[in-house]
């Protein structure tokens, strides 16, 4: 996408401007031309790919998309195994191999056993997709602590365990990709979903922090991403999940409108997330988006066309806090250095720089 107000497809901009121009990426709720499966057929042939939470809607779609790309699939589940037809579907789509492994990612021992088994049987791991998730809706002060702790264990501890176990392997082979399925809930505050929001926010920042460490070591071929998979109808997003809350909030007169709005929020195809993950796993965006938070509903081609804009602003596609007047997170204003504010205050008072407690 290019035009009078858009950067070229190479991501360059007029050097006379202070900042690269930006335009809003196109929005999608289904697979679009840039990530069509036929473009990636066989692109990940024989790449050993672990997908956690493979029994759910998002997990099955991920498996099918990576099958098209020719990956060797290791599909994990905990309580509910994937449907028996999933293996056949994936093989028919082009998967190099498909195996199922029972694993509770909330437990370190389970993650250790999984990694050991995969390395013994496959000899390597190329791609890790942390997709398993848990969400226990409820009032924070009445919800059992066990529910909150379980959400942290599945949504944060599990990805941490597997990343921690596989990172030395990725470093030694100088390649590897981690796709952490986070959520937009990790970027906003949502009532009655405290554990989910908190754990997903932590997952987004965990991804960014680990990528920073890899970049320091110039291990750019080990690339990590956190993603909002879109609004997808699944067991976790059924309106029945929120019915207990409607007995408390909001008032009964708004229940119908509330449930209808809840339904319309979840109309994205799970294959939109699946094919975005395939595209990222090939490395086509690692020069721009590694370590970043990606909303799969945004056109990836449009994002890549603005590579320079993203590189010039570390707050893009990242968790970010804003303050009044452009005050930066380090406590300084735009163009200021730490301590400048104290100097200004002292000058205004006609005194010296500095302050002696308690000052009266």
Regions found by a protein language model. Give the residues of each.
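Active-site loop-to-helix junction immediately N-terminal to the catalytic Tyr of the SDR YXXXK motif
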Residues: 143, 189-197, 209
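Residue(s) in the substrate-gating loop at a strand-loop-helix junction
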Residues: 183
